[in-house]
């Protein structure tokens, strides 16, 4: 007999990843780069003062490219503007401070924030619990089927997992159990994460 079982464990995220960027423009490439460098350095220093460790700040993108300017009729003016982008990827280990961290970054010169991702720093215990629940769920189904069919359930012959055990977010929204940081900071909701495990179990029938 082959049955499947599912186990789910709901957790509150305790870590976040955010991409913070500085975008500058200028008619002179070196000037645009210099301005961007100054703003980016100010952002990094502000983040470090907000208890973001230096090892949790990583530059992920730096780009500079020319952009043609156009007039009201859509015709090129011959003027060139240089676009400079610099992005850093940060890890926030205190979710209660994430709103303040974003505020600090913006006040220091950041003008691009994207890709806020929440995660669980240590999900091993939750994964083990979800696996136990999945096996117990499969066991219960097998016992019910055996009883309904007047069969005797034997030993487990094989257990396999499928569907993965990747945590995924479940947004409950404000007031629905989600961690929300408001006050004077940017309001950010971490929601909840669900670790889901599915198993397939083969039983001997006697």
Protein language model annotation of sequence segments:
Residues 1-108, 112-206:
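Short, charge-dense linear interaction motifs
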């Amino acid at each position: 007999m082959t049955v499947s079982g599912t186990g789910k464990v709901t957790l509150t995220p305790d870590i976040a990843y955010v991409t913070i960027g500085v975008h500058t423009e200028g008619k002179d490439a070196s000037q645009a780069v210099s301005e961007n460098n100054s703003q980016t350095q100010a952002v990094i220093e502000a983040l470090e003062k907000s208890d973001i460790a230096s090892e949790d700040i990583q530059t992920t993108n730096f780009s500079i490219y020319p952009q043609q300017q156009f007039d009201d009729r859509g015709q090129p003016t011959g003027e060139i503007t240089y676009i400079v982008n610099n992005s850093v990827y940060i890890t926030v280990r205190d979710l209660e401070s994430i709103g303040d961290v974003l505020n600090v970054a913006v006040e220091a010169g950041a003008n691009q924030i994207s890709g806020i991702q929440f995660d669980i720093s240590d999900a091993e215990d939750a994964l083990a619990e979800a696996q136990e629940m999945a096996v117990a769920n499969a066991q219960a189904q097998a016992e019910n089927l055996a009883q309904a069919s007047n069969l005797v359930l034997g030993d487990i012959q094989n257990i396999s997992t499928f569907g993965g055990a990747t945590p995924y977010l479940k947004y409950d929204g404000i007031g629905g159990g989600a961690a929300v940081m408001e006050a004077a900071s940017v309001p950010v909701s971490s929601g909840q994460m669900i670790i889901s495990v599915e198993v397939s179990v083969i039983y001997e029938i006697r």
